[in-house]
């Protein structure tokens, strides 16, 4: 096929990569910070502050994927069948992906996992965005507070080592 007839890419590449397997989700659940509201739970792991774990020839998959210049953050969506049928679940996933794309600068260097609840479907996009921004800024403030405590040598209940 001649080069003149080839279509150019019409969509820009997405700034996130998805969490792929159970071990990646479990790492965010166990080591990350979490926040809950009646509509969804948000788990956040700051990968920029965490040193990559390297064993014999094994590289940390989460940290390595962020070193790629096109990938700003990692996103995981865990939508249960209790939330609704496939149409409802997919609508929620599209909205959450769109939210993270819209606020990609806030999500930079993070691994995010969303766990929506059944009431999440009844929210419109703007209400969902409001709850997402409140939770994300609260978690980021919490993480900064914990990091400052660790630098000073103070171990609080919110500071993870």
From Swiss-Prot:
Source organism superkingdom: Bacteria
Keyword field contains tRNA processing: yes
InterPro entries tied to this protein: Ribosomal_Su5_D2-typ_SF, Ribsml_uS5_D2-typ_fold_subgr, RNase_P, RNase_P_CS
Keyword Hydrolase: yes
Key words, A-Z: Endonuclease, Hydrolase, Nuclease, RNA-binding, tRNA processing
GO MF annotations, alphabetized: 3'-tRNA processing endoribonuclease activity; ribonuclease P activity; tRNA binding
One Gene Ontology term from the biological process aspect of the record: tRNA 5'-leader removal
Enzyme class, broadest EC rank: hydrolase
Entry EC number(s): 3.1.26.5
Catalysed reactions, semicolon-separated: Endonucleolytic cleavage of RNA, removing 5'-extranucleotides from tRNA precursor
GO cellular component terms attached to this protein's record: ribonuclease P complex
Job description of the protein: RNaseP catalyzes the removal of the 5'-leader sequence from pre-tRNA to produce the mature 5'-terminus. It can also cleave other RNA substrates such as 4.5S RNA. The protein component plays an auxiliary but essential role in vivo by binding to the 5'-leader sequence and broadening the substrate specificity of the ribozyme.
Assembly with partners or alone: Consists of a catalytic RNA component (M1 or rnpB) and a protein subunit.
Family to which the UniProt record says this protein belongs: Belongs to the RnpA family.
Protein name: Ribonuclease P protein component
Native source species: Helicobacter pylori (strain Shi470)
Lineage of producing organism: Bacteria, Pseudomonadati, Campylobacterota, Epsilonproteobacteria, Campylobacterales
């Amino acid at each position: 096929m001649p080069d003149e007839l080839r279509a150019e890419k019409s969509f820009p590449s997405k700034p996130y990569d998805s969490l792929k397997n159970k071990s990646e989700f479990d790492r965010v659940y166990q080591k990350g910070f979490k926040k809950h509201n009646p509509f969804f739970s948000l788990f956040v792991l700051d990968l920029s502050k965490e040193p990559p774990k390297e064993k014999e020839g094994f590289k940390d998959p989460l940290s390595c994927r962020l070193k790629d210049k096109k990938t700003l953050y990692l996103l995981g969506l865990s939508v249960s069948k209790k939330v609704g049928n496939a149409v409802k679940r997919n609508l929620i996933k599209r909205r959450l992906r769109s939210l993270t794309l819209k606020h990609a600068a806030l999500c930079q260097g993070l691994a995010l996992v969303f766990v929506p609840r059944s009431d999440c479907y009844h929210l419109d996009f703007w209400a969902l965005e409001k709850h997402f921004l409140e939770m994300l800024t609260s978690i980021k403030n919490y993480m900064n507070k914990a990091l400052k405590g660790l630098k000073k040598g103070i171990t609080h209940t919110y500071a993870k080592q």
